[in-house]
C-alpha cells in the first residue's frame, strides 16, 4: 500500500484574505495574490490560517478561497488549508470538504 504521507519542505506563507470596503471577501484580489505568489520561490501556500479572520468567515467563503487557491496555484506548489473548528465533528466535515475543494 502506498504511503499517504509526504515530506513538507520549503516556505509556505500564510496568505491573507482580502476584503472589500463592504466587508465581503474579495475573491478577485485573493486570486491575484495567489498568482503573484506563484512567481516567487515559495513551496506552496497556507490558506485560512489560525491567526486571522478565519473563525469569522462563512463555510462557503472558506471553501471558495480553497477552490480559488487550488485552481490558480502554480503546478507543484503545495496547498494547505486551516480547517480547525470548535468541535471535532465539524472539523472533520470541513476538512473533508477542503480536500474535495483541492487542499
List the model feature ranges, each with a label:
Residues 2-13, 17-103:
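Active-site beta->alpha loop and helix N-cap motifs at the rims of alpha/beta catalytic domains
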